[in-house]
């Protein structure tokens, strides 16, 4: 265990397996995955959900506000205009935040499904692929009718086992079934119902499914018939028989001009009925007929037979037929590297070369092969040796066997030239490049490409083809470069984690048949996932059953599925039990401490960012604390970082494998490999991995365990109940004379088992009682196999273990990944799966090492699962994934056992564990070893063991009737034909690094900050931007001289690292709210709104790329603002009285951070930030007048001008100098300026400005304010506001006269001394400030300045803060705006750049400009706080002509769809 993995793991996996899996584990970026196909996603998912159920995963294609899908449609209730608007908003969001995660709902909630594409909207290649398959099946059907094959009459010598098998298989099929197979090509025709002469009973159901049930009197008769149709073509084993002469005819129903194609005699004697069907299935898809093989490019197919059904034999038989009867010359077989030798041995056994046969061999008994089998394995280490093998294969023909990794290296240019990057020492001498060698390498590359890809072989065969689960992985890309369309995928588990992996595999053998990933996700993935869980709605369940059947029927022509039911009739019984194990005290303490740390850090630490490593650490805990203790002692090795962070960030789970020649890098490598299929996992998406996270956070640390393991005693078996039960199972099995296998993902766990074995004695098997006791000794009494075991050593160990005469070796320790493929261990009949794998197929493949042809004894499987831990959750997800596979691939109806929340909430932590049981009920346990374990160790088992398959029982009562199947297909066709096409831009999986400064805090170190979060807090990846109503929030008075850090850090309950953040360059400000703030949730009835109560202290955190509100209980909300200002019902527009940062400009009301800055020839001083000392100083000068303006607002005349509801401010208001509502697209760090001065250091010269809303009045205003109030009451009444329908979102405090750019803007402009400049003339109706903050002066009152001539106060709506300069399209410097009598269609701004509060005095504004210089006489002069209108020519920014075209209008119709929105991210 010297090579600890960087994730804190152990030498845990097999480098051999990792080498061949390296490219497979290169999962593509979530974004690419979503585009190319996974979307949600779910993404997932799905993870999860699922990894599989990620489903994920998959919100990219769905609209979260839509209605639940119905049985006949997956459309939403959104109207077309609504969808167009959302599409437009999606584009804006995508441009603003291309990495934003698309999934908005909590991962455990059901997804809504977009409308399906119309059939005519499908890609042309998709329609062509489906049409080709339809024509192929029609041709085959026509051949069956024209050249019907006779029913084989099987002689008795060929029938002994078949007769026995079928006798136990149930009732015989009716005679009419024996005629021939019939494939239904079109179910949309209504003629079938008319031709039916049978009576149909229409049953009106009042149950939860309000649909029409048609009960056909013949349905019950055809139940068995339906069973036979499930797996595709050639699955009726009654027809899959030898003829009277013992021959096997391959080309059934062939035209008379074609010859009969028979299997070789030795193969015909060996194949089983289901294998005959598989060979015929391969022939129909790849050859079809001898004539068409010469003229067509052929088709691909998937042979999806379960493990142990002899797929290798079927392929070898088909290859022999292919070479004998067709012009095919080359076949490429790409297989897992550790099965290469097995494939070669199978070829030599079933089709021996001529030289291997005796001289007196009779061809009618054994027919030798006439083609060569070439192999590329680890013996060919140089390019020259590989090129020689390749050249021999191309010239001589035959079969070439190679591993996946070898194929990837030889076909991808990037990997060929450089290989996997390796760390090299700095050379002290210059590097010499051999140009001749470079030329040779390039020549090799061209030859490889020609042989393998262009044109490539005639047929490609991919064993364990479920590796093609990611269309963006390099191996998948390399395989898709092959030009041959005759592609075969062999897999026992076509659907492992999620439907998208299934789609990737189908898309390889039949490109474009299921459409794009988006089309497939919409039509099948999300409807099927929505109905998978026990809390799905009845409509979800029904739609899921319908769509599962439709998908199964679509693929049955080229996907042949045969399950373990075939094995059950040939093999002894198999019993698979799950034992839920309790944690010991030290394990529970460690696990509790670990989960507490996770909940405290949320997604900010390495655990939240890298769930793989969290799983690895947990695996150390529940397997045995000694493993964790060993890792803690070697923590320096654990920090070597064996997971590629960049790869992990892009893929979600992909783990890099160590280069060849290095020892396996521990448990992380192992688990990462085993979890590599979790690309779509909602588990991974839900915790929100930040790809820009600092590298240090991705290093596993064990400091949290140091205290608990200070006085830990190693070598105590009882510290792990799992280990106690394991040794009980081993010893009791040996006593019964049974050999046993032990599978674990962790190499360090296998090493620990070896340590405990060395201290114990081998039990006495039957018949050896008199012999002396012996210790367990490796390679004598037990074997071990992992990825580091050489291929030749593997074969020796396996053969020796399976030898019946070997009575000394009773135990075989295997790593799950290395030992689950290409290993036949029928010498054992008991298996212990020590830890649950992420991918259910790995554990299932481990089981199939013993339960396969050749097994003579009953098999017993024991799965040990740590209860009340993450492992139990992973096991639950295995059941869900397997259930989905049964439903889609096998067309079964497994029971729904878990809610989606149970399945997807992997990090759920149960604090209270039930008390140990005194005894367990063992009446239902028949197996003696397990029964004894329950009697001996009831305190170590949480509940009675149960059968694994009991959770996957097929509910035959839920099977679709023929009428329902017909309805399912019709509804699918109708959905394709009638729904409106809709495409939505892709959203990236993760946020950009806007919160990098926050998440860079190492949360798992005792030396750093450990925030306190709520116990029930769960990480949430993102929340969909929602519409929100502005909510009032006024800052409370902060004591004079309080600084940001002191104000924020004086409250110990906050426990917030202010200094840490400030050193990182993050602005932190503490604010006390004076009114309740509701954080809007999603637009659905099930979401509960969060609330920030009045009087609560919150922190406003503004980094370089984002602004956040942190509440006192630790929740963090990200603030976003997009869209146009909202139009109130009364036609007025509310705007906050602040402005965006000075560095941002406005393009016709649209925020554009990239717009060119206006030149400042006079070098005007610009504020660095909105909260700069200059602005704060200016604000303090008006503290006296604030109360005066506030008091005056309470007069009746003032209130009359405020017809709207009380002022409401965006709940995102948090950081000074920003605005929501003034600029339709505002940056992430822009918040309302109402909090401008709160918490800022003010110095000693000026009192702190107390800014309050009209609900909080000063009890006794100062005398200065009283006098100001008396003066203000002499002002004029407000002028009525003129309606203005078409306007420009002018972000300024000045009225915009009629604009000549639009002929509709013809309202005459009249300037009256008493009119309010903000609401006069043709000001846009949606830009009136009175409704957003009531009267803007209540926030930042304006007073006369001694330097500026005062004018009469106009009204209660007098000028407030200027939000930004006029749009640049309105600032044409060629117009002489300072001429007294020259009429302009619009006013020029006072400043050439946005100022914080333009009404306040500025040295730029000359106080002695005459009123005659105004654009309109008297336009600006009557208003207090404004200088006379006019602007120096030099201050006008250059006219930006290209922005004129971006003018947009707003209407009241958009008020509920095109509003300022806040994106709230709860952490």
From Swiss-Prot:
Compositionally biased residues, Polar residues: 1136-1155
Domain Helicase C-terminal: 728-896
Record localization: Nucleus
Binding site for ATP: 305-312
Region (Disordered): 1-150, 186-234, 649-673, 1120-1171, 1184-1221, 1247-1284, 1445-1467
Location, primary (coarse class): nucleus
Reaction catalysis annotation: ATP + H2O = ADP + phosphate + H(+)
Cross-link Glycyl lysine isopeptide (Lys-Gly) (interchain with G-Cter in SUMO2) placement: 115, 127, 272, 665, 682, 759, 901, 1014, 1018
Modified residues (Phosphothreonine): 1260
PTM annotation, UniProt: Sumoylated.
Functional summary from the UniProt entry: DNA helicase that modulates androgen receptor (AR)-dependent transactivation in a promoter-dependent manner. Not able to remodel mononucleosomes in vitro.
Record protein name field: Helicase ARIP4
Organism from which the protein derives: Homo sapiens
Gene name tied to this protein: RAD54L2
